[in-house]
A protein has these predicted regions:
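Membrane helical hairpin/interfacial module
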Residues: 1-2
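Intrinsically disordered, low-complexity regions
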Residues: 6-7, 200
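Alpha/beta enzyme core
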Residues: 7-23, 27, 32-151, 165-176, ...
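Active-site-adjacent substrate-binding region
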Residues: 154
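Thr-Gly-centered strand-to-loop micro-motif
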Residues: 157-159
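Short, highly charged low-complexity linear segments
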Residues: 185-187, 212-213
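Extended, intrinsically disordered, low-complexity segments
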Residues: 195-239
Length: 239
């Protein structure tokens, strides 16, 4: 929303899907909306899925604002993802040791949060971290399983771009329904650009060539992640 205004990105994706891939069901999702105005603007533009991230606020403020936004979304037939707990960013914690007890989603509090706000999905914190920040040695699978038992609703995992297959499969088994992947795609894109430009005396000045290779690198990451998550080949089941 900050970089492209939202409307341009939405129009681009919607046009591509409707004209080239009409057989593929696509959700256009707002990730980590930080306030009511951003969520409202995304829905007015046409986004059919939104997230409000109030995880940096006090619990009472997060609950109150999330509840207000959930009502706004549901009146318009839009699902809302909330977040409880704190998935740290690298810029917030650096390389320091983290007291993970301060960051985790509390299962009982999550049950109350979902009941009071009426959200449709919950992003959880069980030792995961954004931007390749230092993670907990192992995710708190027991905590994740307890959250899943109490809520029985879609649970979302942020900050797991670097997870290997074993951790991912176990998280799915314990209740995760969706992984948000960002930094792994960025790394693939930038790494590809670096390889085609650095030290290449005959480098092309056709930016389309370099961006095409970077796009291909991101595509490979997405394909591998989809296979790891068990998401490949499911168009017919969700269409």
């Amino acid at each position: 929303m900050d970089y492209a205004g939202g409307r341009a990105i939405y129009g681009l994706i919607k046009n591509l899907v409707e004209n080239y891939y009409p057989q593929i069901p696509v959700g256009i999702h707002l990730d980590h909306g930080k306030d009511f105005e951003v969520v409202q603007r995304a829905i007015e533009i046409g986004f059919n899925s939104v997230m409000y991230d109030g995880s940096r606020k006090k619990y009472s403020d997060n609950l109150m604002t999330t509840k207000k936004i959930a009502q706004f979304c549901h009146e318009r037939g839009i699902n809302l993802q909330g977040e409880l707990g704190n998935v740290p960013y690298l810029k917030e914690v650096g390389s320091t040791e983290i007291n993970w007890d301060d960051y985790m989603t509390d299962p009982a509090q999550a049950e109350e949060f979902v009941r009071e706000t009426g959200i449709d999905a919950l992003a959880v914190a069980v030792g995961n971290a954004h931007d390749f920040a230092k993670e907990r040695p192992e995710p708190d699978y027991e905590r994740l399983g307890e959250i899943n038992r109490r809520l029985n609703m879609p649970l979302i995992m942020h900050g797991a771009s670097d997870w290997e297959t074993e951790k991912t499969v176990e998280a799915v088994r314990r209740g995760i329904n969706c992984f948000n992947v960002d930094i792994a795609s960025r790394v693939a894109f930038i790494t590809s650009l670096g390889k085609t430009i650095d030290g290449n005396k005959s480098v092309s000045f056709d930016v389309r060539e370099h961006l095409g290779l970077a796009r291909d690198a991101v595509t490979e990451v997405v394909k591998k992640k989809m296979d790891m998550f068990g998401s490949s080949g499911k168009i017919e089941s969700v269409a």
